Amino acid sequence: MTTLNLDGRRRAAVWRALEERRFDLLVIGGGITGAGIARDAALRGLSVALVEARDYASGTSSRSSKMIHGGLRYLSQGDIALVKEAASERQILRRIAPHLARIMPFLIPVPSLASLAKLRAGLWSFEKLGGVPESERHEVLNVAQFAAREPLMRVEGSNGAVAYPEFLTDDARLVLANIRSAQAAGAVVLNYAEARALLFEEGRTAGALVRSTLTGETNEVRIRARLVVNAAGPWLDAVRALERDGAEPRLSLSRGIHLVFARARLPIENTLILRAEDKRSIFVVPRGDFTYVGTTDTFYPSSDYWPKITQDDVAYLLRAVERWLKTPKLVDGDIVALWAGVRPLIAEPGKKANEVSRKDEIWTAPSGLVSIGGGKLSAYRAMAARVVDLVVERLEATARACATAEAPLPGAEGLEAARSALSHLGAQGERLIGLYGGEASSVVADGGDVAVEARRAVTSEGAVRLEDYWVRRSARAWFDVRAGLDSLVPAAAAMGALLGWDAQRQADEVAHCTQLEKQCRSALRPDAREMGHG
């Protein structure tokens, strides 16, 4: 199936393809790590299958702070190698997917000359480690310059700020780009396909029993593979338990939440890195007509797809914004949308969540099952390369060299032409470029409305539920007026026409998304749960 089009109508054919042959590699997990591994392995010439229990990027990989950053704060934790890798990987992503690496000035207030000296020393190291070009190195702003650059900031008592460029992304679209690229290179990929058991031959992992989790599908297949990689993110330990019941957990889960406001309510021009009351750094990030704030970092007991958000989480972020920004007091009713995600960190007993390293780690079980946990969105490509290097070694395979640092991701080609063609559309054009890159021109040519996006989500991007489009293909759940609720009915109609949904199924899909939105807003004060959508 060497095509970029992930057609949600062709699932029956994909199910058949999964059991027709023995693959070199089966990847369990369709987040950024699994998607990166599948793409790398397929580009090297291995036969690859990937299954995801829900939708691609439905876990951690759609709930991040949506940044490709070098991890400056990890220098203070001594993670030099992590910073070097993440800083270098930023430049690679900028090259292979420029539409998914939007450069943005980050401003960090400095309270004293001593803190300025310390910060600059860290930035010099960061820039050297990451090969940052001269034109993109940091600059120091005095108080007057700081106030002029970001008028909403409270600059009293500060010694100015440091400005340096980092990159923003759309995390779910980055996953999807890797999935589509993997399929174009020959991988067989499928969402809503859960690994329920592992297969063994002579004590070695030899595949998985996979069952559909999609309403109306009853498919169950045995996928045979010479090697299995567990890249299930927060569900990594659950997959490891399929190999050996009672296996010692490797992960420590941490929850992070984000709040979204109308840009008119929080009209900043730069990404701001602010100190919260507990000395943690939080981000305030402009994105189109919206501004989002995050994140928290607290241990969380379970690997939920939709983690519970608490009133304490919300209040913590609101207090940080109020402390630093000269804006009328933000209240729950100002919140347009909010999301929470769970980070799959490597367990380090005795440490607070924000102290746990973001390094990745690879384990190989006695049966040969390879598991990878931890890591950062910024370094996904390098993480994948390490895993595939190990796979090639274990299989003693003849494989091509890693090509993921050079091969462009879908949407990279034709980007400047599309940007020029869509420039007259203003913010809407920028939104489409951020989602589709060079492919945005065809979206506009087809009409560019919700129905066009929703149809494309089905025919080219593997969407088979309304949630897939609303949350992960379009980001309307986070970055749209009224949390994108007004898009649900027309999107359901467009998807339903392709997927054979009757009126009741369309209504059920809309109700499901509406319930998810209410679940997220349940953390707000009762009088604000139906507000904030203006």
What is each model feature region?
Residues 21-23, 216-227:
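Core beta-strand elements of the Rossmann-like FAD/NAD(P) dinucleotide-binding domain
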Residues 182, 239-257:
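Glycine-rich beta-alpha-beta "Rossmann" dinucleotide-binding loop(s) and their flanking helix/strand
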Residues 19-33, 49:
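Beta1/beta-strand and adjacent pyrophosphate-binding region of the FAD-binding site
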Residues 1-25, 40-44:
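Extreme N-terminal leader/targeting segments of oxidoreductases
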Residues 191-206:
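A conserved short coil-to-beta-strand element within the FAD-binding core of flavoproteins
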Residues 42-63:
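Glycine-rich FAD pyrophosphate-binding loop
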Residues 66-149, 282, 417, 427:
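Dinucleotide-binding Rossmann-like beta1-alpha1 core, especially the glycine-rich loop
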Residues 13-17, 54, 100, 112-122, ...:
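C-terminal accessory subdomains/tails of enzymes that are appended
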